[in-house]
């Protein structure tokens, strides 16, 4: 039976994942009643609190560009870049990126060289020029705008000015790349311009530079003239035409030009078909994470529920076949392959970034908080582990179960042939550049505007947001929290005058007993998991909202992956703590075959690292069958002095468990941890106390465990 996803059913893909106790716990009773009256300064006449699935779309936001008719109204509206300023550990990730590989990639990557670069040439000619520059710039520039870093902003503007100045008379711009050599008529490759359009949109949000709109208008007018048989025909552009579609709608919402909707239909018609029931046009991990949203994007124009359903079906299909693992992603290293669905199968760093990007867009389009839940899962449990703690090196592939990170060729255990598990700043060409956008896109979409001129807190972290609400008043909301390493979020309102607007607070699906206080007064409301608390009132400066999100231990069983289990505490999933031995290697001698660097790049300043296990990793967990959660103890530790809880060994939350070694579970002939043994498994080894740490802080990890019989 096919579910109409407009009802946004909350079922997890497939019955293969069984919650023993935890994230998928029973929902609270349904109610739409306003909250009970609160005493003191929270007056009943001034307060309406209720749990809602999503904001209504009976009106459209008055203050920010949003979907124009005939596009369906968005449930959430993106705020301009730099509206959200992170603090605490979240800001620390951006600072580490700025001071690490992201901020210095211009000194290393040949594709960011200013010599013979096609992005700097009016005719689009040059030795260097494809996806790498915009991949990097869309993250680098947004980090600069958000941190208000003058050097990063200046460097970003150098490239943006070149793009604006070098648009050709035809309206086309960027590297003049043609694909289909040997064909009678090779086609102009449009893929590389798609991420650059995202860079231009961020720059326009930051600067309001009208030249961006003019460039895009001329470029899309040129796209309309490209013959259909030459339009979006190469593999990458054909798979990822949905990115082009997003940019067309972005411009339409600012100009109202109806010809853009004609172009949107042309793009949809010529993009790979992501609406095929039970299969995908290809199984490349980044294409999937980036392109599965294309049907739901076009649904905004088509109003055809089959388009929306197709996106949900694609997401569910991939998780059903290859995503029966913790961390929110799926195994596809580079492509997903039948028979390779064990948690040792990896995902590209690019794939994580594109999943976070897709989730943010789908959250706006559908109002369905499951997309925010998945962003949390990916960002907190997978993404940080793709880097060394200082963000000066990264690896192409990261897996939920990964006990070695080195320069060996692990093919065919993984699909890629080469040193794809090595932490190397000179390697991983696409991920080396695209990684920059991961955390900053998470930050930018942590707060959103709503159609009823309010604000929504989507992804909790220490931050502040400046936005226009209600009658047009500019307010500042400050969130004070160490979430996900604590259970409470404290929000303070600053406003020049009293202003009425709704504030939406997302209740994560794992949280079964959220509680709300306003100005110290408890508000009686059923906060349903997966919904939003909508707080409508007349807000005054220094009003204070406290949201408690009590975290519980949870154990998930992956029936399709040998009955293995994963252990959660709130939004965090935990890995065995494996001692990590770092071995420094030459960055230039351990690269993938397509790596290129500038002649003056100093490899001695940017070493590569192998990470080898310095302790046993092959354990089975002992579980209390009647109460699995009782098998674990939560241990709180001090906050790290450098403010980075994802650095190796610094997480302020750990778990304790018991287990036994499984001697037969070893490194296999491909140099990977062998596939999981079927649980329950027997072992005569002594019982040991095991230390578990958040998997996002574990570069070597076992996050899907066998269980003992």
Which residue ranges define each predicted feature?
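Aromatic (Trp/Tyr) and acidic
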Residues: 39-150, 183-206, 242-259, 263, ...
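Hydrophobic, small-residue-rich alpha-helical packing segments that form membrane-like cores
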Residues: 220-223, 227, 234-277, 281-288
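C-terminal beta-rich recognition modules with glycine/proline-rich loops and embedded aromatic residues
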Residues: 34-59, 311, 373-381, 386-492, ...
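Asp-box/WD-like beta-propeller blade repeats and closely related beta-sheet repeat scaffolds
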Residues: 179, 183-184, 213, 219-234
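Solvent-exposed beta-strand/loop surfaces of large extracellular or lumenal domains
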Residues: 511-537, 555-560
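Signal peptide processing junction and immediate N-terminal pro/mature segment
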Residues: 23-35
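Helix-terminus loop motifs that line ligand-binding clefts
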Residues: 136, 150-189, 322-330
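N-terminal secretory signal peptides and thylakoid transit peptides that target proteins
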Residues: 1-16
